[in-house]
Regions:
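Short, hydrophobic/aromatic beta-strand segments
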Residues: 95-102, 113, 145-148
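Intrinsically disordered, low-complexity Pro/Gly/Ser/Thr-rich segments with frequent PxxP/GP/PP motifs
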Residues: 109-147
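Terminal connector regions
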Residues: 139-186
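Charged, amphipathic alpha-helical linkers/stalks
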Residues: 174-243
Length: 288
């Protein structure tokens, strides 16, 4: 780290995920940890930059973002159905490496991401040096999964090949017309068309997955076993357990150990069988 801070080494890494501004911006925020017995991924394909781009949500750091002590210029983009070619020039005063990213996008507004990463290449350049690079598209470029055919199909439409330094720092663009099919899944309406998946209803999600949703609640009359989690504890034992964990959490907060206090959240999804392993012999199989 010291070598990077002092400039002895020029950084060239890129973020492999998007950093949101706040947790409420995350596509799964309305449902994550909100149910007892199920975990619903109603966001479907809208994960990471696919969601933030589709819904127009500002982000703190975009997918593919990175820092460098030099600057790079992109030029002379040429596009075919299989690859993108361009020239990259180091326009700064120090040597560096750039990760050039190619996204395939469109403006049709259907049930699909507005752009998806399809290829990338890392090129190291001295000050003033240029390099002509070719970036092949991924094997599923211009394709979508068709649940009716149970396979990936090429989707026919006009695409925009976008080349940039991150998902939100696009330097060059060129359109290309691709012949193919139009799977019916793309015509899905509602939240899945707009990308505003925070508003996906249970009915929309059931229609997407093709089956009714199971109950999100634990069965109240089912007996507990070794694989049941502590949060399922009921009756006097459950009440004592909740009071005890809450007291530990509050005590840790009072003495300023806020990180340790957060660890108490990990108790609830822990199965009863874990007590035996973590109690140093205080809890035996017979006790469970």
């Amino acid at each position: 780290i010291a070598r990077i801070i002092t400039g002895a080494v020029n950084p060239s890494g890129k973020l492999a995920e998007t950093f949101p501004i706040r947790y409420e911006d995350v596509p799964s925020a309305p449902w994550y940890t909100k149910a007892e017995a199920t975990a619903e991924h109603r966001e479907s394909i809208y994960v990471g930059y696919r969601y933030y781009d589709k819904a127009g949500v500002p982000v703190r750091f975009p997918f593919g973002h990175g820092l460098s002590y030099t600057t790079f210029e992109y030029s002379d983009l040429e596009v075919t159905e299989s690859s993108a070619r361009l020239t990259v020039t180091n326009t700064g005063s120090v040597a560096g490496a750039e990760v050039v990213q190619v996204y395939l996008g469109h403006a049709d507004g259907d049930f699909s991401a507005p752009q998806e990463l399809s290829g990338w290449a890392k090129v190291g350049l001295a000050p003033g040096e240029s390099s002509r690079i070719a970036i092949p598209f991924g094997p599923r470029a211009f394709s979508a999964y068709d649940p009716e055919q149970h396979e990936w199909v090429r989707v026919g439409r006009t695409y925009t090949v976008r080349v940039g330094s991150s998902s939100r720092d696009i330097r060059l663009e060129e359109e290309i017309a691709i012949e193919g099919e139009h799977p019916a899944i793309l015509d899905r309406q509602g939240a899945y068309q707009t990308g505003r998946v925070h508003g996906v209803t249970a009915g929309e999600f059931e229609d997407l997955i093709g089956r009714p949703l199971p109950s999100p609640d634990w069965p109240k009359d089912a007996p507990l076993d070794r694989n049941s989690v502590l949060a399922q504890a009921r009756g006097p034992f459950g009440a004592v357990l909740k009071l005890g964990v809450g007291a530990v959490r509050n005590g840790l907060k009072l003495v300023g150990k806020h990180t340790e206090a957060q660890y108490t959240d990990y108790v609830w999804p822990m199965p009863f069988r874990a007590l035996e392993r973590m109690s140093a012999g205080a809890v035996t199989p017979e006790m469970l």
